[in-house]
Amino acid sequence: MDTIININNNNQKYPQSAEEYHKVLCNYFITLQSAMQSTSRPSSSSPPSLPAVSSELLSSSFPTNAPESSSRDLAPKQNQFTINVVLFDEKKKKNPEENLPANGDQLATLRSLMMQINPSSPPSIPATSPQLPLAESENVPESSSTLKDHKFSLNTMLFNVKKNDAVKISLANQEQWAKFHEIGTEMMVFNSGRRLFPLLAYKVSGLDPHKLYCAGVHMIPDSAYKQEYDHDLQQWVNCLNQKKTIFKPTSEILGRIENGFKLMSLGIDMSDVKIFNIAIRKKTPLQIEKSRKPNLDKTIEVLIQYKYLPVIKIYELSNSGMEKKEIAQATFPETSFVTVSIYRNQKIKEMKTLGNKYCRTDRKQIVMEQRGELEQ
């Protein structure tokens, strides 16, 4: 059957123009149709009959200014339309019209003809020719996901931080923080700075033992409203008669640079983090800096009677240590606290005095004596 259909085996003269090539192609499909009808095959494997080629397709003419093609240029095109290539070559079946002239009615007629050759998987043919301009109605809408949520958009490449899911952070002293959180944690704030208690201590896993890392802590507001202590409820509540506060980003306190093995075995100790507040702004900047003592890089400025939440971040450092990349961050609700200038809840004051190793011994004795008197 190939010898009947293949143009190369019929000793025909190669077409000398695009118009002649088009007519030869149409005659080829007519010959293909008659050959497939005359060949007897089982009903399960026999392909559907081809429709008759429209007279419009045969009589259609190409533009007069169409460039003429030599027989050498058209020879490889003829080989692409043998029966084996059309029916069994998967690459050509995907888009058999790739090398055909895209000319209006001709392309539409050929498309319908090819879809009936293999109706189960019709070839994907572009609806418009590449040479034609895109119509206004075919413009991609702005809400299209291909434009809005593109994987390689500029915002994704610049601002999306890729987190390492293998890195896990947990609170080392979670039970202690939970006891304070049940009552309502308060943190005393001075101009010179004061350590947090309970201390910030974390456990981490999933790091590369040989790479260098460092941890950082900063504060975020846990409520936009100023807090007031309700003595009847014995807890802090939002002061709703005031406007919401716009917070400035707090500074970040960085820990020591360690390798992954040491951080995973010893944990992350951020006990040197302090918070401070400047109550009197009439002081000069030099007086303010002197009142805060030397460790300026370990203090975070906060507002009084506001609720804050510590944020822990882990950075992976380059070999030179000059560049860092954030790989994980975490917050824990039980570590939220209210900044105060004086303790309002006496239970919090007692727990801090007895549990804080930095508290003076005489203060601890006073609290223990008061507790003993209350028990008696």
From Swiss-Prot:
One of its GO terms (molecular function) is DNA-binding transcription factor activity, RNA polymerase II-specific. InterPro entries: p53-like_TF_DNA-bd_sf, T-box_DNA-bd, T-box_sf, TF_T-box, TF_T-box_CS. The keyword Transmembrane does not apply. Pfam families: T-box (PF00907). Residues 38-76 are annotated as: Disordered. Residues 38-63 have a biased composition (Low complexity). The keyword Glycosyltransferase does not apply. It comes from the Eukaryota. Transcriptional regulator involved in developmental processes. Directly binds to the promoter region of the sex-determining factor xol-1 to activate its transcription. Its activation of xol-1 transcription controls sex determination and X chromosome dosage compensation to promote male development. Has a role in the fox-1-sex-1-mediated determination of sexual fate. This is T-box transcription factor 18. It comes from Caenorhabditis elegans. The gene is sea-1.
